[in-house]
Structures are given as structure tokens and as C-alpha cells.
Amino acid sequence: MNGGDVTVAGSDDLKSPLLPVVHNDEPFERQTVGQQLRTIFTPKNCYIALGPLLCAVVCLCVDLGGDETTTARNMLGVLVWMFAWWLTEAVPMPITSMTPLFLFPLFGISAADDVANSYMDDVISLVLGSFILALAVEHYNIHRRLALNITLVFCVEPLNAPLLLLGICATTAFVSMWMHNVAAAVMMMPVATGILQRLPSSSSTTEVVHPAVGKFSRAVVLGVIYSAAVGGMSTLTGTGVNLILVGMWKSYFPEADPISFSQWFFFGFPLALCIFVVLWCVLCVMYCPKGAGQALSPYLHKSHLRRELDLLGPMNFAEKMVLAVFGGLVVLWMTRNITDDIPGWGRIFAGRAGDGTVSVMMATLLFIIPSNIKKGEKLMDWNKCKKLPWNIVLLLGAGFAIADGVRTSGLAEVLSKGLVFLETAPYWAIAPTVCLIAATITEFTSNNATTTLLVPLLIEIAKNMGIHPLLLMVPGAIGAQFAFLLPTGTPSNVVGFTTGHIEIKDMIKTGLPLKIAGTIFLSILMPTLGAYVFASMGGV
């Protein structure tokens, strides 16, 4: 075995070892001191050491103003440690997300039970149930069937390139409303690139390719990644940022009413719709020149799409039941808490049932309802759930733990003093400023990390200004989702960039006007529609 001999002890040999002994005859090559040092001092190991080293520097050298701020200083050191590992990816992101479970108790920030509670609450339940439903949709190819049907509707004759682009983008945005935007981008990108595979490229053919063909390809890929981001803004389940915001609101203001799914939808959907319209217009102006439909029509025809749809066959019982469960979930989410005058079904349970309750309950049905494909088989089994994105679940838990630690340690109050200049500015100037700050930071860090860092500070600023905290929390969280300029901004951007159809200059050219438009719409809608939607949330 591996070039060695295996000696097995006889049953009557009491001096022989109980386990087999492997004799490896391969010579052991001793490393020199230089080789050993090169093995130890690799860039990744240096990045690993950077986290605790920076933490030690903060804890030993930083003075936040008195002995009573010791816990806040420790919290700052732990934050620096975690963000160093997140930025350098020295340690896998899910593992870094679990470090609060041991760092917070060891540094005297929070008790172990309190930290662990952050990793499993109603918001996490909402995410888990949604992810299981999304896996069911993906398993039965419902997303592909939906995309092909909608694209068929918009693929008119003669071909209208802007209209076809609208169909692809609208489908992606709709899918992203009901599942995580990264999952939506991952699921929709193969559908989009499948359509683009019919188009010729200058590298694969000797024929002269019309410039509109390449431009339309860029428009489709950009449309998918940006539509996934924009669509995710409209619902709580569309992106982790919205869930982090809800969790922080619940943590900082436990006596206030929680942000419900329907409440966020009434604000998030109009905002997302406005940004989506701008996205489509920008893509049409930049990438759909006159004559694009005529150039694309030889390669894109309804018959091609119908052929792919025919390959999927008619909808079977399992697909219909998954859609029924998904539809029931959306209805229950929207009707749990409607208005003060129309209480919704949540009143029956005295407010004890949350959106996570519904999410897990409907996901459980998938393991009970038969699929009618094989005898005894259910719509879902646990083997199909092995692709659950636990990294996102752990990241959300870390965000909630950090938010709670920043609050209880007093770090938020200390850091907010550095932004005291904002307290004297009018709200109409603060909202876009906060949004732009978040939108800038999120290009270089994950949107979840940006939200986790900024929102606690914005809460303290809002308290000092005497305004409703959500008037600053929402612009900070939404701004963190405007990662439109760089491939590294979000995983969705990476998905699009790796297709080879777009370059960084395409993202900057398209993303910059989108970022500006999003900031303007948010600055207008938050003090108007947002004030109306969130007005009933007292206890602040």
C-alpha cells in the first residue's frame, strides 16, 4: 500500500499492535531551513496572521476615551480581525463568519448563548425555507420553463431587440424577487447565454459580424446581473442585505413592530421598478442601436425557443405542486400583516407567527407531498438540499452577531461621534450622502459586510438627530446594494463577468448612471413613500 508493506498482528501475538502497521520504504527528504520558512511564510499564511495582529494593535494602542470603553475597543479589534479575513479571503468566508461564536465570549463582548442566538432566529428561518423552495424550483427546471415562456412572449416578429431585452431582464428581476439575487443570477445566466450561443461571434466565424450582435450580447449579460440585483431589492428574501436590515431593526428596537414582508414590498417594489426602468433604458440606448432587430432576426426565432420548451415537455404533477406551494408562500407572506385597519391572518396567532414561520412550514410541505414520479417519492428529499448555501446563512448570522455586539459594547455610540457633522445637515442632504457612502464602500467589500458596518452607526446618528432610524437605515442598506461598477462587487457580477461577454469598462459605463439614478430615486421615495409605509412602526 503506497509502496509499503502492511504487517497484520496475529491473534496469538500479544506483543503485536492491534492495528495494522504500514512500513513506508520511501526515503524522507529533509527540508532546509529556507524551504521550511518559505512553506510557513506564504502570502495566505501572512494574511491569516494579519487578522489577529491588527486586532492586537487595536486592543493595545487604540484609546476610545476612558476605561468604560474597553469593551467597545475590544469589539473594534474583533471587527478589524474579521474584516481583514473577509477582504483577503485568508480563511474561507463561512469560517470567518463563525468567528464571533468564540471571539465575542473570549473578548468579553457577549455571552456564548447570546452570540449563538444570532445565528438562528426568525430571519434565518425565513432564509432557510426560501432556499429550500428555490432548490425545488431549480430541481424541476421551473425557472427555465418560466424564462422560455416569458421570452417567447417578448420575441415578436419582426424581432424587436429592446423588447426581447426587456423580457430577459424582467424575467430575471421577477425570479430574483422570490429567491436570493445571487441564486437568481446563477440560474438565469445559463438561460441567457443559451440564447446568445445562437449568435455568431467575431472569434468563432470568418464572416463579418454586425456590431449590433456583440452589443446585444453585452446588454443581455449586463441586464441579467443588474436585474437580479434590482429585483432583489423589492422583497426581504431577494437579498441578504434586506434581511440584515430587518434583523438589526429587531435587535436594536425589540419593542417596535418588526418589518414584515408585505411592508417592505410596498416600499421596495416601487423603488426597484423605477431603477429597473432606468436600467432598461440605459441598456437600450447604449447597446441596442437602430437595426439591431434586423441583425439579430436570422439567429433568434420563436421556433428555436419553442423547440427548447418542447424538450422540457408538459408540466407534470410535481412541477405544478411546487408552483402551488410557492404561490401559497407568497400569499401568506403578503397577508400576514396588511395594515392597521386590515390586520391579516397573523392576528389569529397573537403576532407569534413570523415570516420565517411561514417559510419553514411551506418548505416542510415539499417533503410531505408526493411527486407522483416514483412510488413513495416526495417533491423534495434531503439529498436535494445538499446544495443549500450555508455560506450565506452563516454570513447573515455573523451580521446579526456583529450588529448586536456593536450595540451592546457601545462601539456604535463611540463611532457615531465621528459622523456628528451629519447631524446638523438637512435630511434631504443626508439621505443621498449616506446612500453614496454605502454605494462606494460596497464596490470593494461585500454588500452584507457594508451593511453590517454602516447601519449601526446610522442608527446612532438618527437617534441624535431625533428622526426615525429607518430614514437612515434604509438608504444605507439600499445603497450597499448598488455594487454596479466592478466585477468583485457581488458574486452576481462575477457570474456575468466570467461569461466573457462583458468587460470592466462596460460595467462602469452602464453601472454609473444606474448608481446615480438609484440614489436619486431613493432620496425621493424614502421621505415620501417610505415615511408613509413605515409610519406605523412605533417604539423608537
From Swiss-Prot:
Instruction: Identify this protein by name.
Output: Tonoplast dicarboxylate transporter
Q: What does this protein do?
A: Putative carrier protein indirectly involved in the uptake of malate and fumarate to the vacuole, probably by regulating the energization across the tonoplast. Uptake of malate to vacuoles is inhibited by citrate and by the uncoupler carbonyl-cyanide m-chlorophenylhydrazone, but seems to be not affected by sodium. Critical for pH homeostasis.
- On whether Membrane is a keyword of this UniProt record, the answer is yes
Query: Where does the sequence pass through the membrane?
Result: 46-66, 75-95, 123-143, 164-184, 219-239, 265-285, 311-331, 353-373, 392-412, 419-439, 466-486, 520-540
Tissue-level expression: Expressed in leaves, stems and flowers.
Q: Where is this protein found?
A: Vacuole membrane
InterPro entries referenced in this protein's UniProt entry, alphabetically: SLC13A/DASS
Which GO cellular component does the record give, naming just one? Answer: vacuole
Q: Does the keyword Hydrolase apply?
A: no
Q: Which UniProt keywords apply?
A: Membrane, Transmembrane, Transmembrane helix, Transport, Vacuole
The primary gene name is TDT
What switches on expression, per the entry, is described as:
Induced by malate and by acidification of the cytoplasm.
* Biological process terms in GO annotation: malate transport; regulation of intracellular pH
Q: Which Pfam families match?
A: Na_sulph_symp (PF00939)
- The record's principal subcellular location, in a coarse class, is membrane
